[in-house]
Amino acid sequence: MNIIMVDHMKYQHNITSEIINNIPVIYIEGDLTSDADGDAKNVYSEVKEKYSPHKVIINFENTKYINSSGIATLIHIIQDVNERGGVIAFVGLTEHLKKVMNIVGISDFVQMYNSNNDAVKTV
């Protein structure tokens, strides 16, 4: 499991990953901002190098806040997965985060599920 925890004065985040049924799940806890950008990309890169996955799940159950830098990070990951012919799923989005994903158009490129189990069964 990859674990990166950062606690800045304004933003806090914890980005981890695990494998469920051979599918990497990346957990984004706290805030997905420019402070988390490098850590999110590093965890994704480690998962990519180790497992070369064609399916990736990103779990937002404990994500509190996302800004434009966080959106850019997600777009980077989505593009990379799509370029390799893969599928990406988002799990546990709040209604607010779903609305944000719809507004910026990300929801057109990912599958959305309520739980890891739902995503693992379908992806």
Label every model-predicted segment.
Residues 37, 116-117:
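Residues at or immediately preceding the N-termini of alpha-helices
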Residues 9-42, 60:
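STAS-typified acidic loop motif
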Residues 22, 95, 117:
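Residues that form or immediately flank small-molecule/cofactor binding pockets and catalytic motifs
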Residues 1-8:
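N-terminal amphipathic/basic-hydrophobic helices that include classical n-h-c signal peptides
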Residues 32-110:
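Amphipathic alpha-helical interaction surfaces in cytosolic regulatory modules
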Residues 111-115:
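Short acidic-hydrophobic, aromatic-tinged amphipathic segments that line or gate anion-handling sites
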